[in-house]
Design a protein with these regions (language model features):
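Aromatic-lined carbohydrate-recognition surfaces of secreted/lumenal glycan-active proteins
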Residues: 135-151
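Substrate-binding cleft of extracellular glycoside hydrolase catalytic domains
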Residues: 1-129, 133-135
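Hydrophobic anchor at the start of a short beta-strand
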Residues: 58, 138-140, 164
Length: 222
C-alpha cells in the first residue's frame, strides 16, 4: 500500500482534485502534518478533510521538540486538544497518529551532553503513545529515522508492539516489523517530489473504527 506525507511545505497540495489525482496514481494513504511547537500547520485542516473526501485514508503527525516527559505531556495534550477542536475522530484518522521524533541539532545536543539518554528517549516516545491511547485514540505510533530508533532507543527491545514508521532511504528497511517504511524523499506524487512510504501493517485500515461523528462536515455527511 502506497503512502505519501505532506506538511506546510506542500501548501500547494490542498484540493480534493489534488488528492483524487494522487489516489488515481496508486496512493492509498496520506499523512498530514498537524503541527510543531504548539503551532497548527496552516493548511492541515483543508488537507485532512479534502483527502478524506477524495477517498484516501488519512493520518496525522506532530513534530516533537520534547526532551523530557513534562514537555512530552504538553505536546500530547496539545495534540489531543487540537484534534478535538478540529472535530476529528478515529474514524477520520484511519491511518493513525504519528509522533515525529527525529534527529536534529537540538536533540543531538541533548544526547551528546548526556541530558537525554536512550532510556529517556524511549520513555518520551512511550509516554506520548500512552497519553493519546488513554484519550481514546487507538492507533498511535512513532516516526523516526532508522539510526535513532535502532541505535539510540529501546523501542524494539522494550515495547515492540508500538507501531513504527521508519525512515530509511535505502533499498530495504532494516528495522524489524515496521508498520510503514519511508523509503524516499523524492517520490513522484502528481508530478511533485515528496516523501513516500510503503505501508506494510495497517490493522486500522482493515478494520476501521465505526463512524462516530455528527460534526456535519462534508466527509462525514456522506
Amino acid at each position: 500500500m502506497k503512502c505519501f506525507d505532506i506538511s506546510d511545505w506542500q501548501d500547494y497540495f490542498t484540493s480534493v482534485d489534488d488528492f483524487k489525482k494522487a489516489k488515481d496514481q496508486g496512493y492509498d494513504v496520506v499523512i498530514v502534518k498537524l503541527g510543531e511547537s504548539y503551532n497548527e500547520t496552516e493548511c492541515c485542516r483543508t488537507q485532512i478533510l479534502n483527502a478524506i473526501s477524495a477517498g484516501l485514508k488519512v493520518g496525522i503527525y506532530y513534530f516533537s521538540h520534547a526532551y523530557d516527559l513534562e514537555t512530552c505531556g504538553y505536546e500530547a495534550n496539545w495534540v489531543i486538544s487540537k484534534l478535538s477542536e478540529i472535530g476529528l475522530t478515529p474514524w477520520h484518522l484511519q491511518a493513525g497518529i504519528w509522533y515525529d521524533y527525529e534527529d536534529h541539532t537540538r536533540l543531538r545536543s541533548h544526547i551528546n551532553n548526556g541530558n537525554l539518554t536512550y532510556q529517556g528517549i524511549t520513555n518520551i516516545m512511550c509516554d506520548f503513545v500512552n497519553r493519546l491511547n488513554n484519550a481514546g485514540w487507538p492507533f498511535v505510533g512513532i516516526y523516526s529515522g532508522y539510526s535513532l530508533l535502532w541505535n539510540e532507543t529501546y523501542m524494539y527491545s522494550q515495547v515492540p508492539w508500538v507501531p513504527i514508521w521508519c525512515a530509511q532511504y535505502n533499498s530495504t528497511c532494516d528495522y524489524p516489523d515496521v508498520y510503514m517504511w519511508q523509503y524516499s524523499d523524492q517520490g513522484d506524487v502528481c508530478g511533485h517530489s515528496m516523501d513516500v512510504s510503503e505501508v506494510y501493517k495497517a490493522p486500522w485500515l482493515e478494520e476501521p473504527p465505526k463512524k462516530k461523528c455528527d460534526c456535519g462536515c462534508s466527509c462525514c455527511s456522506k
